[in-house]
């Protein structure tokens, strides 16, 4: 059982010093460039060293492992406590890649964390399942062609995830970074804690207990989920 702490998020360029007071760092980098399989081990070693040095939780850039596109969460002690494989693929850039088949929600002192890889954020049923599993924070790293980017891609992705599931959501992308919250607890009741930008660092404070003030959402039927789990996860 964890006593929930305030999460002080810093979105910034890889391996640069985190914003003062941050306790969780989300690397932006160039999310269009996934760390290749042959470089992943050394990259993660550097990430673990960074987290340990600055005593922060860290969500690195996406990386490849045995054909899967992955994200992971590293503790301030420099240990990987969980990883998530992409369940759905962005086929123009991932031909031949493998698809994951399971979701993992990681328990932290801030609350439940779910890592949403690439286009999984545009599958609301998947994020809903993660929320039912206890996720209070959704972190998404994705890529998209410049010609595909519009405000609709933000609203239908991480913003929608926050509104539909009463969770906090942070996204990094080669076209934008932003942080979202349910309308009722966002400062201007627009669903944003940090509006889309490419400037870094982006710094935001969040507390999972604040989600209790949100209007209650309808729960997903566990019986319905059990019957259709295969379809929900693709």
Regions found by a protein language model. Name each.
Residues 1-9, 105-115, 137:
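Beta-strand-turn-beta hairpins that frame and shape the catalytic cleft
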Residues 5-40, 142:
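Short, conserved active-site loops that position catalytic residues or coordinate cofactors/metal ions
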Residues 16-23, 37, 49, 53, ...:
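Eukaryotic scaffold repeat domains enriched in small/polar residues
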Residues 24-28, 59, 115, 137-139:
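Structural motif
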Residues 39-59, 124-202:
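CN hydrolase (nitrilase-like) catalytic-core segments centered on the catalytic cysteine
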Residues 60-64:
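Short beta-strand-to-loop element that shapes/binds the nucleotide-sugar donor at the catalytic cleft/hinge
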Residues 66-133, 149-157, 193, 211-234:
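Active-site catalytic loop in hydrolytic enzyme cores
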Residues 71, 103-105, 179, 201-206:
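Conserved hydrophobic/aromatic beta-strand scaffold that supports enzyme active sites
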């Amino acid at each position: 059982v964890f006593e929930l702490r305030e999460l002080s998020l810093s979105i910034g360029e890889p391996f640069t010093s985190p914003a003062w007071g941050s306790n969780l760092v989300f690397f932006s980098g160039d999310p269009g460039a996934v760390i290749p399989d042959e470089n992943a081990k050394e990259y993660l070693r550097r990430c673990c060293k960074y987290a340990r040095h600055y005593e922060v939780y860290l969500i690195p850039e996406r990386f490849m492992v045995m054909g899967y596109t992955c994200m992971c969460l590293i503790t301030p002690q420099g240990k990987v406590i969980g990883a998530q494989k992409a369940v759905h693929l962005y086929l123009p850039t991932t031909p031949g890649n493998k698809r994951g088949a399971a979701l993992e929600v990681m328990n932290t002192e801030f609350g439940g964390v779910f890592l949403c890889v690439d286009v999984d954020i545009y599958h609301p049923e998947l994020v809903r399942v993660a929320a039912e599993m206890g996720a209070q924070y959704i972190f998404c790293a994705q890529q998209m062609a410049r010609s595909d980017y519009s405000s609709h891609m933000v609203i239908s992705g991480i913003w929608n995830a926050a509104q539909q599931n009463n969770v906090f959501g942070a996204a990094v992308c080669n076209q934008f970074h932003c942080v979202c919250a349910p309308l009722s607890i966002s400062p201007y009741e627009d669903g944003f804690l940090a509006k889309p930008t490419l400037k870094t660092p982006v710094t935001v404070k969040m507390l999972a207990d604040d989600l209790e003030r949100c209007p209650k959402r309808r729960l997903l039927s566990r019986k319905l989920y059990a019957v259709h789990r295969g379809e929900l996860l693709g």
